[in-house]
Every structure is written in C-alpha cells, then in structure tokens.
C-alpha cells in the first residue's frame, strides 16, 4: 500500500512539474558547420557522422571534433552539431573566451552580425572565419501550444527562476517559439555552474511587469 501511495505522489509531482515548470538543459561549447567548411575541415564530400540525437527535433551531436584557436590559446575536442547550416557558427562560454583570449558577444543563435573571427582546425584542414564566434544568449525553445499555456510569444524577453542546487533567477531570457521545437530552456555551463544545475533541473517563467 505504501509503495502504491509513493508511486501516486511521484506521478502527481511529475504532472505538476510539467504544467508549471520547464526542463533545463546545459549546452557545452559546440560548432555548427556549413557544407563548405565541412569539406575544408574533413575532405571534399565528407558526411558528418551522427553520434546521438539532441532534444530539439532533427538536431544531433556528431562523432567529429574540432579545435578552435584564438590569440591566447586553443580548445580541443569541440563537438560538431548537425545538420549543416548555411553559415558556420561557434558557440562558447565567457570562460572559454578567456582561454581563447577573445571577448565574444552574447548573441542569439543564427545572428552573426558583430560576432568574432576564429580559427577552426582538424588534422585534415583548417578554416579562418571572419565572423561566427559568440556566446549564446540564454533562451527557451517552446512549442506554440506551450507558448499559449505560459502566455508568452516569440522573441519575448522574460525572467526564469532555475531550481538548481543554488536556485537563481536569470533575467534577459528570450522565448523562441516554433512548431519544430520541443520545450526546453538552454543555458551554458557558466550559467549551469552558477545555479547548481544537474540533469532534471527545472525552471519557472516569470513574466516582466
């Protein structure tokens, strides 16, 4: 009887979390490559090797790794995400920027205006980007249905209280709504460390007045 009650309580808690909270994911440094740059880094016509699917539909981590280099230093074994994009983009944390000797701007993914140059290399080749290095702005991917439920809209800026081991309210969180998304909040590892993130951490949206 006690086990049954515990199962019921756990199910109720899970349902409440899904209704009121959003699951948080921490994203490490990574690279999105254009078709042209895949050819330069791995060879003409090379196909990236899918390693595992990510939470967002159609997105996946690849087996391939690259090195990124700035004026002060390099970071090896940076994961490549697929599929290919129109333009190459490198997403790092502010701490990574210190290692590289670069103060990368905080930008939304895909907005390359004002981003920095960076070198990407493998044992087969290298690419010198004129732009593309950024720190990703913290954001929430959201389905239209969930956007309606949480009463938010695409590109809206909200606060989000992350219930990690050290609960923390983040300001300047951008909502991104699309039929192609699953609902997750994305932060980088600097932010994850600040709030004591662990797998299963959730966040609550706080609407701005």
Curated annotation (Swiss-Prot):
**Which cellular component, as a GO term, is one annotated location?**
bacterial microcompartment
Task: Please give the cofactor(s) recorded in the UniProt entry for this protein.
Answer: Zn(2+)
* Chain positions recorded as CoA binding sites: 26-28, 72, 193
- Family designation: Belongs to the PduL family.
Q: Which residues hold phosphate?
A: 85
What are its E.C. numbers? 2.3.1.222
Q: Give the pathway.
A: Polyol metabolism; 1,2-propanediol degradation
- Name the predominant localization: other
An MF annotation (GO) of this entry: acyltransferase activity, transferring groups other than amino-acyl groups
The record describes how the cofactor is bound as: There are 2 Zn(2+) ions per monomer; Zn(2+) and CoA bind inbetween the 2 domains in each monomer.
One Pfam family hit: PTAC
Where does the chain bind Zn(2+) 2? 139, 141, 186
Q: Which UniProt keywords apply?
A: Acyltransferase, Bacterial microcompartment, Metal-binding, Transferase, Zinc
Instruction: Indicate where this protein resides in the cell.
Output: Bacterial microcompartment
Binding of Zn(2+) 1 occurs at 30, 32, 91
InterPro entries assigned to the protein according to its UniProt record, in alphabetical order: PTAC (IPR008300)
Q: What does this protein do?
A: Involved in 1,2-propanediol (1,2-PD) utilization within the bacterial microcompartment (BMC) dedicated to 1,2-PD degradation by catalyzing the conversion of propanoyl-CoA to propanoyl-phosphate.
Write out the domain note.
Answer: Formed by 2 beta-barrels, each is capped on both ends by short alpha-helices.
Q: Which gene encodes it?
A: pduL
The catalytic activity, as recorded, is: propanoyl-CoA + phosphate = propanoyl phosphate + CoA
One GO term of the biological process aspect: propanediol catabolic process
Protein's recorded name: Phosphate propanoyltransferase
């Amino acid at each position: 009887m006690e086990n049954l009650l515990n199962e019921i309580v756990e199910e109720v808690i899970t349902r409440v979390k899904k209704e009121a909270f959003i699951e948080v994911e921490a994203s490490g440094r990574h690279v999105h490559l254009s078709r042209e740059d895949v050819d330069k880094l791995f060879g003409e016509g090379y196909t990236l090797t899918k390693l595992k699917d990510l939470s967002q539909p159609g997105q996946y981590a690849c087996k391939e790794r690259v090195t990124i280099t700035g004026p002060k230093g390099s970071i090896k074994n940076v994961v490549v995400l697929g599929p290919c994009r129109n333009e190459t983009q490198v997403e790092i944390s502010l701490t990574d920027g210190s290692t590289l000797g670069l103060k990368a701007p905080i930008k939304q993914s895909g907005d390359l205006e004002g981003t920095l140059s960076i070198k990407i290399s493998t044992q087969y080749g290298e690419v010198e980007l004129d732009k593309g290095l950024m720190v990703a702005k913290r954001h929430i991917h959201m389905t239209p249905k969930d956007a309606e439920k949480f009463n938010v809209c695409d590109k809206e800026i909200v606060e989000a209280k992350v219930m990690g081991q050290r609960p923390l309210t983040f300001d300047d969180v951008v909502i991104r709504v699309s039929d192609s998304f699953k609902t997750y909040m994305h932060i980088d590892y600097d932010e994850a460390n600040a709030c004591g993130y662990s797998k299963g951490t959730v966040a609550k949206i706080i609407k701005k007045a």
